[in-house]
Amino acid sequence: MPRRRSVEPRKILPDPKFGSELLAKFINVLMVDGKKSTAESIIYGALETLSQRTGKEALEAFEAALENVRPTVEVKSRRVGGSTYQVPVEVRPARRNALAMRWIVEAARKRGDKSMALRLANELSDAADNKGTAVKKREDVHRMAEANKAFAHYRW
């Protein structure tokens, strides 16, 4: 952490097919071992399947799914006088997106479908319908924050 001024976050180039920075970030989250073209083909295949299934435009359906998974509050551990409290804090917008993308990719990887593109399409479809593993994860995080609302005054 620099002392003088805050570091500007790097600008990410939009993805080549849809021109979306959000989708480019999602491609980077999905990418394994630097294989970006593989990640792109998986995502574009999943989005094609998703748009056929929902009847919406691919990017619109993707953003709807992401919106349903984004958390608004989370808990952070805070040590006060020898005991650790789970303190609910609001999630910054950039972290909301990052967590949502990570949870969707994790949930898709755990699914038992044939190809990764199909697994991702199914998870995005479920997320758009407000169900699925990624949405359940968000609900769990929100429930945890709600349960620990009494410790909100320990925020820093």
Curated annotation (Swiss-Prot):
Part of the 30S ribosomal subunit. Contacts proteins S9 and S11. Keywords: Ribonucleoprotein, Ribosomal protein, RNA-binding, rRNA-binding, tRNA-binding. This is Small ribosomal subunit protein uS7. One of the primary rRNA binding proteins, it binds directly to 16S rRNA where it nucleates assembly of the head domain of the 30S subunit. Is located at the subunit interface close to the decoding center, probably blocks exit of the E-site tRNA. It comes from Haemophilus ducreyi (strain 35000HP / ATCC 700724). GO terms for molecular function: rRNA binding; structural constituent of ribosome; tRNA binding. Belongs to the universal ribosomal protein uS7 family. Pfam families: Ribosomal_S7. One of its GO terms (cellular component) is small ribosomal subunit. Gene3D superfamilies: Ribosomal protein S7 domain. One of its GO terms (biological process) is translation.
